[in-house]
């Protein structure tokens, strides 16, 4: 049966109005009504709502340089404004988690590298050839869908890749790393996409044993960053 997400959401709105009426709520038949609208269960329905939200909420796409990201992100969160930041840089830099104990900050300072601090326990070395996605949204369940959409877009561009937890891998090698957290009621998603890796600096900065070897997309496939940007923008239109 074809899914009717709009009808299902209208039904859910009625159902939510019965939350204080136990008898009416039990008699409503929420699960049966979901099936009537083409959804096998609540898991499938919630995923469909995520997809509908991502496509129909009018989330704008904005380019931002990593040096301006902290300011632009804080401003958007303070305003409660949803946005997809496409993050670029002019040089090699470091994402450093505030709980990262394996990050060589002495080397970073000695070499004058820009550091973007974030809530986390890892350090990531990025280059000017890379791209990162910074999604701010009020829908707190979107991170897994965004990772899957990104993996699908990369497959459409010729990469044999797949999602594994918070990473996207090709032949077991890590080309994308992501994470999310909630701040002031907004989901903050950060997803780093490596096109070209700087192995020398990764070795010098990241002392944590590597479970998944980082690789650049261009080592597997001649994917153009602009083509991926176009794919990402299409998710929101």
Label each region the model flagged:
Residues 2-141:
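N-terminal lobe of the biotin/lipoate ligase/transferase fold
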Residues 7, 14, 20-26, 32-37, ...:
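Long, positively charged amphipathic alpha-helical accessory segments at protein N-termini or as interdomain linkers
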Residues 116, 178-179:
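Beta-strand scaffold of nucleotide-dependent catalytic cores
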Residues 118, 163-164:
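Residue-level detector of family-conserved "landmark" positions at structurally sensitive sites
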Residues 170-171:
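Structural motif
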């Amino acid at each position: 049966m074809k899914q009717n997400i709009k009808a299902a959401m209208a039904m859910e709105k009625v159902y939510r109005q019965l939350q204080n009426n136990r008898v009416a709520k039990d008699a409503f038949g929420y699960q049966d009504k979901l099936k009537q609208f083409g959804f096998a269960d609540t898991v499938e329905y919630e995923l469909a709502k995520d997809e509908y939200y991502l496509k129909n909420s009018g989330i704008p796409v904005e380019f931002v340089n990593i040096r301006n990201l902290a300011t632009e992100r804080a401003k958007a969160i303070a305003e409660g404004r949803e946005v997809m930041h496409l993050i670029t840089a002019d040089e090699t830099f470091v994402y450093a988690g505030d709980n990262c104990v394996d990050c060589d900050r002495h080397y970073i300072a000695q070499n004058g590298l820009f550091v973007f601090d974030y809530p986390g326990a890892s350090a990531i070395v990025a280059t000017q050839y890379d791209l990162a996605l910074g999604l701010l949204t009020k829908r707190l369940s979107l991170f897994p869908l965004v990772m899957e959409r990104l993996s699908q877009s990369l497959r459409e561009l010729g990469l044999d890749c797949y999602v594994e937890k918070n990473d996207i891998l090709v032949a077991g090698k890590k080309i994308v790393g992501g994470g999310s957290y909630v701040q002031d009621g907004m989901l903050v998603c950060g997803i780093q996409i490596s096109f070209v890796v700087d192995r020398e600096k990764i070795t010098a900065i990241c002392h944590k044993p590597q479970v998944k070897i980082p690789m650049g997309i261009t080592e597997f496939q001649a994917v153009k960053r602009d083509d991926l940007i176009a794919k990402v923008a299409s998710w929101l239109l």
